[in-house]
């Protein structure tokens, strides 16, 4: 594997000195880029794009050709594991992801296989290997998975949900069934992420998109407990370097201390959290990633720059901050605005790291 030329993203996650604050964007390979739309059209649909090694590699690299980003993230979907378990993932226009055979009972859960990452999910590992090779050591590659709780919400609801009544019904009336599902998912995620690391992923992110819909007690029991199990089961060093792990619970600002206690290296913050407050609470234990409101990218570049300056000042001096949006970039954002955002982070963050030169 090529020697890493720009490692500031990995260094910041491990709270080691950096020259400027590193930056990448959730969903940086996506529909806001015209070249992505062309490649997706070529693939036919989203799932075919994920499963085509060459095209998944191409869309991963597209934002890096445009912008001086400090990391690449594997182009894939969080629902690859439930799909590999046989639930039949498909996408309904305007509806988002759906499953042909959602989970309805304890029997359904008992029958679920734990997918082999090099077999049913081999297409993901092929993409990781191809992307890692194509990056030529320019920037690190982030691998990822959905959290067990978030995967379970889609598997039980049958797709996206607003009220989460089906999974909450199981959680409160058949908790042992839900725990069995979450345990199977945690085991599957450990295998899946470790396979990504062996294939070349240099950092790992766990997306807990729906943890924020839970009460504090239920979050600990049904979401965080299983992310903790995953953190404990991951390969944390590969190719002579540490492999940092970031946990991101959207709506999880109340639980940063508990999240930091899992042994992860960093926490992703959504835009509803004050980064200064977050650093005060957990900055001595973990790095922080985030957390500009993705909708700020609709604003004129001067306003974007102002927001970047505010967030940098909120975090303050020194390392331990990876700049990002608080969630994925919206599909109708002008690419030039994303470029202005990335440039502003690098330019304006220099003074915060001067003691490190």
Curated annotation (Swiss-Prot):
One of the record's GO cellular component terms: cytosol
Pfam name, any one: URO-D
Record keywords, A-Z: Cytoplasm, Decarboxylase, Lyase, Porphyrin biosynthesis
Binding annotation for substrate: 27-31, 77, 154, 209, 327
Enzyme Commission number(s) from the entry: 4.1.1.37
Known catalytic reactions: uroporphyrinogen III + 4 H(+) = coproporphyrinogen III + 4 CO2
Keyword Lyase carried by entry: yes
Single GO BP term: protoporphyrinogen IX biosynthetic process from glutamate
Protein name: Uroporphyrinogen decarboxylase
Species, as recorded: Proteus mirabilis (strain HI4320)
Gene: hemE
